[in-house]
C-alpha cells in the first residue's frame, strides 16, 4: 500500500537539487497510495570523496515533510552535478510497523547502506526469513517486512561464489525466496549507476525519455536458470554476452533517462513512453541499457515487452481551480460519464458496442450466471446495477464482496461469467478472486480505470471505464463510470431481445441526457454546503432508501464515514422495522432518498415511520415530488431520469455533502486517515 518512484539519469547532467526535485514531484503524484511516511536514497558523496556512499533521508508524515527535511542536510552539496545517477524514493502506508522514520523506506541492508530497497506489497514469509538472517548475525532496526529483503540481498552478496556476480542475479536469487506480493527497486554502492526492479502481484512500470533515437520498440525477454551450482558458468557468461539488440538504450550510447513508478501519474509529466512489467520480470539498467529477464519460461509468456504510449495528459492530474482532487473529480463527472459512453453508445441507432467484449459476446450469452465482484465503492456500483442487469440479461446476478467471496470458497463453474470491478485494477482481494475464478474455468471480465493494470491484463476480456485519473482517495467519478459501464453491458446483451426494445430505448435516452442532468445537480452545491453547516457537528448520520437507490445509500454513507470520520450507515428502508427504527429520534440526522420509481409508495411508508418517531428527515427527491416534501425537514430536489439511472444523479449530492462536511470539520479531504487509494494488500 505504498508508492514507488525512482529516477536514473544516464549521461544527462543533473544537480543533486534537480534530482531531489524530480524524486519529490514523483512522490507527490503517488501520495494517494500512502502518506504516513516517506524517504529517498541518493548518492551521498561529493565528487572529492572517492569512497562510494548512499545517503538516506526519511521522515514521518507526508511528502511535504520529507521535502523540507532534504534541505536541512548540511552534509550534502545541492549544487554538485552528476552525469549519471540513480535515486529511489518511496511514500508509505504502514502494513508492518508503526509510521516512523525507521520503518519508512528505503530500507537498508546494514549501517553502511550497501544495499537499499523500496517496496510496495506484503512479504508473507518475512518472519521465517528474518529468523534465518538473525541466526546468521544480521541485526534488524525496523519492524518492517521490507528490511528482510534488504538484509537478504546483503546475505546473498556476502556469500557470492564469484566477485563479478551481477546485480540482477542477486535480485533474482532474493525474489526466489520471497512469498507474497511485491514491487521492488534496488540500489547499491557495489553497483553504482545501476538499477534493478522487479514485481510480483504489485504494479510497476518504467518510463523512458531520450532526445535520441531508441534502439527498439520491443524489448526481448531473456531467460536463464541461476542456481548455486551453475551461476559461475551460466549467469556470468550470459550477462556478459548481452548485446545492444537485447536491450533498450539510446542509439550510439547517447543520453537517456529512466523513470520507475507504481503508477503512470508519476511518470506522465516526464514521458508518455512506458513499459509495463509483468509478474516475475526482472528489469536491470546498466550503462544506460535496459534489459528484462525471467527465471522460468512458460508457454503463455510474451516474447517481449512493448514500449507503450500513454494518452494521459498532465493537466488531467492537477487540481486546477479546485481546493481538492475530490472536489475536482466530482465536478468532472459530466465529462467523465460522457467519455465512458463515447464511441460505445450510438444514440441514433440505439445500439451499444463494448469493443473489449465483442469477441466474447457469444460465450457470455451462453452463460448460466453472472457474478460481479468488487470491494468498497466498486462493490456498490455492482449493487446499484444488479437489478437492471437481471432485467436486461434475464440471468441471475450475484454481487459479491471479494474478501467474503474468497472466505466462503464460493462454488464457481465453467459456465459462469465473473466481472471484477476495480478503479486501479490492482485491488488485492479482487485480484485474488479473479485468479480463484480463472482456476475454476469461468470466463473473467475486468472493469477498470487503469490501462495495463493487473486485472486488465489477467482477465479474458474487459471494459475500460475511461473516467480519467482519479487521485482523491474517496472514489467519485469512477463510481458513476463503473455504474454506466455495467448498464452498457446489459444493453449490449439485450440487443436482440424484442420484448426489451422499449426498455432499452428508454435507458439509452436516459444515458444521452445524463451529462446535462449531472451539471444541473452540481449547481446545487451551495444548497448542499448550507446543509453541511447544519450537520458537521453531528457524530452520526443515517442514509436510507430502497430499490435502485439502496446502493446510493451505501455509497453515500461510505463517502461520509471515510472522509468526515462521522459514523454513517446506509440502511435499506425495507429493513427499518427490523432494528434501525430504534435509532430514530429528533436528534438523529436522517437522509432519505425517495425517487419516483416503483418503490416510491414503500418509501413513503418508511418516511411516515421516521416522522412518527419525531425524526427530521432530509429528503433527496424528484423536482415534482410534492408529497415527500410535505414531511421533510429539508429537501434537495433533483432532476428526474429513468429509474435505473437515477442512482447516478442521487449519489452526487451525497458526494458533495461528504466533501463539505470534511472541510468544515477540518480534515484533509484527499488523504483520509488510515486509508489509501490503491489497496494492493489483503
Curated annotation (Swiss-Prot):
Q: Which residues form the SIS domain?
A: 360-499, 531-672
Positions bearing Phosphoserine: 244
Occurrences of domain Glutamine amidotransferase type-2 (ranges): 2-288
* Protein's name in the database: Glutamine--fructose-6-phosphate aminotransferase [isomerizing] 2
Read off the Gene3D superfamilies from this record. Answer: Glucose-6-phosphate isomerase like protein, domain 1, Glutamine Phosphoribosylpyrophosphate, subunit 1, domain 1
Output the NCBIfam families linked to this UniProt entry: glmS, PRK00331.1
The molecular function terms of the Gene Ontology recorded here are: carbohydrate derivative binding; glutamine-fructose-6-phosphate transaminase (isomerizing) activity
Which domain of life does this protein belong to?
Eukaryota
Which pathway does it take part in?
Nucleotide-sugar biosynthesis; UDP-N-acetyl-alpha-D-glucosamine biosynthesis; alpha-D-glucosamine 6-phosphate from D-fructose 6-phosphate: step 1/1
Report which reactions are catalysed by this protein. Answer: D-fructose 6-phosphate + L-glutamine = D-glucosamine 6-phosphate + L-glutamate
Q: Which InterPro entries match?
A: GATase_2_dom (IPR017932), GFAT (IPR005855), GFAT_N (IPR047084), GlmS/AgaS_SIS (IPR035466), GlmS/FrlB_SIS (IPR035490), Ntn_hydrolases_N (IPR029055), SIS_dom (IPR001347), SIS_dom_sf (IPR046348)
GO CC annotations on file: cytosol
- Tissues in which the UniProt entry reports expression: Highest levels of expression in heart, placenta, and spinal cord.
What Pfam families does its record include? GATase_6, SIS
User: Where, in this chain's numbering, is substrate bound?
Assistant: 377-378, 422-424, 427, 578
Q: Which residues form the active site?
A: 2 (for gatase activity)
> What job does this protein perform?
Controls the flux of glucose into the hexosamine pathway. Most likely involved in regulating the availability of precursors for N- and O-linked glycosylation of proteins.
Give the GO terms filed under biological process for this record: cellular response to leukemia inhibitory factor; energy reserve metabolic process; fructose 6-phosphate metabolic process; protein N-linked glycosylation; UDP-N-acetylglucosamine biosynthetic process; UDP-N-acetylglucosamine metabolic process
Q: What is its EC number?
A: 2.6.1.16
Q: Which source organism does the UniProt entry give?
A: Homo sapiens (Human)
Which of UniProt's keywords are assigned here?
A: Aminotransferase, Glutamine amidotransferase, Phosphoprotein, Repeat, Transferase
Amino acid at each position: 500500500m505504498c508508492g514507488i518512484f525512482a529516477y536514473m539519469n544516464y549521461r544527462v547532467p543533473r544537480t543533486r537539487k534537480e534530482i531531489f526535485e524530480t524524486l519529490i514531484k514523483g512522490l507527490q503524484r503517488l501520495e494517494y497510495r500512502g502518506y504516513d511516511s516517506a524517504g529517498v536514497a541518493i548518492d551521498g558523496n561529493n565528487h572529492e570523496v572517492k569512497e562510494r556512499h548512499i545517503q538516506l533521508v526519511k521522515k514521518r508524515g507526508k511528502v511535504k515533510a520529507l521535502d523540507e527535511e532534504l534541505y536541512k542536510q548540511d552534509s550534502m552539496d545541492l549544487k554538485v552535478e552528476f552525469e549519471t545517477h540513480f535515486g529511489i524514493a518511496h511514500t508509505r502506508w504502514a502494513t508492518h510497523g508503526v509510521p516512523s522514520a525507521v520503518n519508512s523506506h528505503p530500507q537498508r541492508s546494514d549501517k553502511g547502506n550497501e544495499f537499499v530497497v523500496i517496496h510496495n506489497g506484503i512479504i508473507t514469509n518475512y518472519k521465517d526469513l528474518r529468523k534465518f538472517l538473525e541466526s546468521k548475525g544480521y541485526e534488524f532496526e525496523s519492524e518492517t517486512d521490507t528490511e528482510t529483503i534488504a538484509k537478504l540481498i546483503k546475505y546473498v552478496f556476502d556469500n557470492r561464489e564469484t566477485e563479478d556476480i551481477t546485480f540482477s542475479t542477486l535480485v533474482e536469487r532474493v525474489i526466489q525466496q520471497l512469498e507474497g506480493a511485491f514491487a521492488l527497486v534496488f540500489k547499491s554502492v557495489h553497483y553504482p549507476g545501476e538499477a534493478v526492479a522487479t514485481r510480483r502481484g504489485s504494479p510497476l512500470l518504467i518510463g523512458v525519455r531520450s532526445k535520441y533515437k531508441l534502439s527498439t520498440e520491443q524489448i526481448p525477454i531473456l531467460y536463464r536458470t541461476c542456481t548455486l551450482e551453475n551461476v559461475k558458468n551460466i549467469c556470468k557468461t550470459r550477462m556478459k554476452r548481452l548485446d545492444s539488440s537485447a536491450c533498450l538504450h539510446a542509439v550510439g550510447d547517447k543520453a537517456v533517462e529512466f523513470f520507475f513508478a507504481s503508477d503512470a501519474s508519476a511518470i506522465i509529466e516526464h514521458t508518455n513512453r512506458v513499459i509495463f512489467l509483468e509478474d516475475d520480470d526482472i528489469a536491470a539498467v546498466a550503462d544506460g541499457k535496459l534489459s528484462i529477464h525471467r527465471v522460468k519460461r512458460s508457454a503463455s509468456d510474451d516474447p517481449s515487452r512493448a514500449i507503450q504510449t500513454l494518452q494521459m495528459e498532465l493537466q488531467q492530474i492537477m487540481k486546477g481551480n479546485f481546493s481538492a482532487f475530490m472536489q475536482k473529480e466530482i465536478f468532472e463527472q459530466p465529462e467523465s460519464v460522457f467519455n465512458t459512453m463515447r464511441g460505445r453508445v450510438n444514440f441514433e441507432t440505439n445500439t451499444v458496442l463494448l469493443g473489449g467484449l465483442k469477441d466474447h459476446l457469444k460465450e457470455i450469452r451462453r452463460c448460466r450466471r453472472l457474478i460481479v465482484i468488487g470491494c468498497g465503492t466498486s462493490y456498490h456500483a455492482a449493487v446499484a446495477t444488479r437489478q437492471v442487469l437481471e432485467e436486461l440479461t434475464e440471468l441471475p446476478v450475484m454481487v459479491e464482496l471479494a474478501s467474503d467471496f474468497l472466505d466462503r470458497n464460493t462454488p464457481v463453474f465453467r459456465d459462469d461469467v465473473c466481472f471484477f470491478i476495480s478503479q486501479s485494477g490492482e485491488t488485492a482481494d479482487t485480484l485474488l478472486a479473479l485468479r480463484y475464478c480463472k482456476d475454476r474455468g469461468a470466463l473473467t471480465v475486468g472493469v477498470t480505470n487503469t490501462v495495463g493494470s493487473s486485472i486488465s491484463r489477467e482477465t479474458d476480456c474487459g471494459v475500460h471505464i475511461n473516467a480519467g485519473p482519479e487521485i482523491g482517495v474517496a472514489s467519485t467519478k469512477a463510481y458513476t463510470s463503473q455504474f454506466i459501464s455495467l448498464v452498457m453491458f446489459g444493453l449490449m446483451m439485450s440487443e436482440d431481445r424484442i420484448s426489451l426494445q422499449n426498455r432499452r430505448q428508454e435507458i439509452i435516452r436516459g444515458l444521452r441526457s445524463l451529462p446535462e442532468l449531472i451539471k444541473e445537480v452540481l449547481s446545487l452545491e451551495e444548497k448542499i454546503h448550507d446543509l453541511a453547516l447544519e450537520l458537521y457537528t453531528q457524530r452520526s448520520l443515517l442514509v436510507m432508501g430502497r430499490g435502485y437507490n439502496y446502493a446510493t445509500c451505501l455509497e453515500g454513507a461510505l463517502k461520509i464515514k471515510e472522509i468526515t470520520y462521522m459514523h454513517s450507515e446506509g440502511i435499506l428502508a425495507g429493513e427499518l422495522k427490523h432494528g434501525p427504527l430504534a435509532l430514530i429520534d429528533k436528534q438523529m440526522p436522517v437522509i432519505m432518498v425517495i425517487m419516483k420509481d416503483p418503490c416510491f409508495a414503500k418509501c413513503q411508508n418508511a418516511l411516515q415511520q421516521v416522522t412518527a418517531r419525531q425524526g427530521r428527515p432530509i429528503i433527496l427527491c424528484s423536482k415534482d415530488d410534492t408529497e415527500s416534501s410535505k414531511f421533510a425537514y429539508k429537501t434537495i430536489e433533483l432532476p428526474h431520469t429513468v429509474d435505473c439511472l437515477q442512482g447516478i444523479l442521487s449519489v452526487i449530492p451525497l458526494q458533495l455533502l461528504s466533501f463539505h462536511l470534511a472541510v468544515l470539520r477540518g480534515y484533509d479531504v484527499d488523504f483520509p486517515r488510515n486509508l489509501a487509494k490503491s489497496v494492493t494488500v489483503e
